[in-house]
């Protein structure tokens, strides 16, 4: 049962071959058995999930089902969930019970999905390996000695291990796509503003975007149908009609123009991944796509610009955690200054503190022009590169990561090496574009991911191409050998 996709489970529920309670209990039992090995969940909401599942069965019996009625999903622990702990992977919020639901949570509730638990993540979404969590590292289900990627590593590992059929993630510099690639699942980062950020704990507000993580493009489309849309509570949410993302999944790829940027195939790319992308190219060509070599000349500046801009926004956003209003508070502070210093020193992990320090530095009066302003100019040039490319191509094909999943603790002491694991995903966030990562092969029993980048609000096209590709391949059907 756990090998089935959301689309298949949805049909089973409609056909009454299984109830939502049975389905939810099956996944809860699987989580209890396997999660202690993977550490992909921070909270498991068993009682709440079974209550929701009973209500879903009642709606199904009355013929009142909505798009995801009865389907268990997991929420990344960055989304506020009313009366359920929302930790953001941090000691700072270990005791935080949100008084309201994030819009992402609200939308999936409206669609009828069952919240089965909150997934582990890098603290405040800062990381590429899920080793920065206060609740311990998540392990990659394909190799328990390797990372699942980050920051949405818990969601990626849970979907890959079939502990849940779908989950939410957030993507600030690749945090949906990189773990999706390393765990062999499908992950979509929508256009900036397509999905509401209300109730999503902020890391870098001009870069953060929520999106779906699932086995297939079809499942990602079903989840995005529920997630996407304008929200007046989020000032960055864009008021644009939401199409039915499942309606165009089977559209022909005849005449599709795909760009191959030479900057993404240079030094640092594992040769097996390069070969897998070439195989994706040949598969799409057989379906009618044509390929054009393009240039994205400012690609090499994306990572340096990102690691100025994201920490700058992080230092501002995380200033609110001071031990006064909510979150961790140190014991017996001698005065207000001591309260601030010790609460933040004890409450934040080392990577978060590193980024706050970098951000404070680049925003300081003497360095603002030299770093922050220059990075913003580079950001515009990167966006312009993409806009020029989209004058001649419909989408862009690249690797999702330079290597397969690396060993736990391999890069934790070398921040630059860790940061470069997102080298193929960062530019997309700087430009605010949509992109999807999907399974494209294996190397030494480890998944390889490809990435498609689209123009603004062209999520439907990305899902269509990925779905058609998945009809011709079975990489997405592979699952790790767990109990």
UniProtKB/Swiss-Prot annotation:
Molecular function, one GO term: ATP binding
EC primary class: ligase
Keyword Translocase belongs to the record: no
EC number: 6.3.5.7
Keywords attached to this entry: ATP-binding, Ligase, Nucleotide-binding, Protein biosynthesis
GO BP terms in the entry: translation
Record-level GO cellular component terms: glutamyl-tRNA(Gln) amidotransferase complex
SUPFAM superfamilies linked to this entry: Amidase signature (AS) enzymes
Active site: 76, 151, 175
Catalytic activity: L-glutamyl-tRNA(Gln) + L-glutamine + ATP + H2O = L-glutaminyl-tRNA(Gln) + L-glutamate + ADP + phosphate + H(+)
Bilayer-spanning residue ranges: none
Family: Belongs to the amidase family. GatA subfamily.
Function: Allows the formation of correctly charged Gln-tRNA(Gln) through the transamidation of misacylated Glu-tRNA(Gln) in organisms which lack glutaminyl-tRNA synthetase. The reaction takes place in the presence of glutamine and ATP through an activated gamma-phospho-Glu-tRNA(Gln).
Subunit organization: Heterotrimer of A, B and C subunits.
Annotated protein name in UniProt: Glutamyl-tRNA(Gln) amidotransferase subunit A
UniProt gene name: gatA
